[in-house]
């Protein structure tokens, strides 16, 4: 190590990819109602971040919403933040297999974005400093290993359509931001969602309702972390 290199840990930043679109799976809606749902859900998510103290606990919070919810803007934001911070990423958007749904449902964040980030990370891991990814996107598990390949230490995802964005988000944020391990925060949020929705959903025959199965969150990673854990790095 040269005298000019610092051993101090980097501060932690949070990047939020926020785009609801106003879409509800399988339900056709008029445009005005989609716009209302889009605005309401996005403002609700930002309120939760303030309520549970994300802006106090993170050194920097960047929210990509509306026209900024695109692949190029997401990549640029992650790379810019990584210059000075280790980055946690919160995905509050819809998704398909291997894809995040961006601005107005017309911007898709998929192979092109991830391939570009992978090239940069493979050339110089220090340029993309991801720590944990938490997502509510449908088919999020299809992207979980991609995030690990980009250097993240833990990620989550649903195998299919995620029908339960709430209370999943609020329970996760409450646990994660008060210092619970990532895996515990994800597990508690998933259990809370299951308990709440099981009051309304009945599959019959002793089987789990397909929405419960589809929405189940899986955690993958190389280690568990808390909000205050310094990212472990290969020597």
What residues fall within each predicted segment?
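A domain-level signal for caspase-like cysteine endopeptidase catalytic cores
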Residues: 2-85
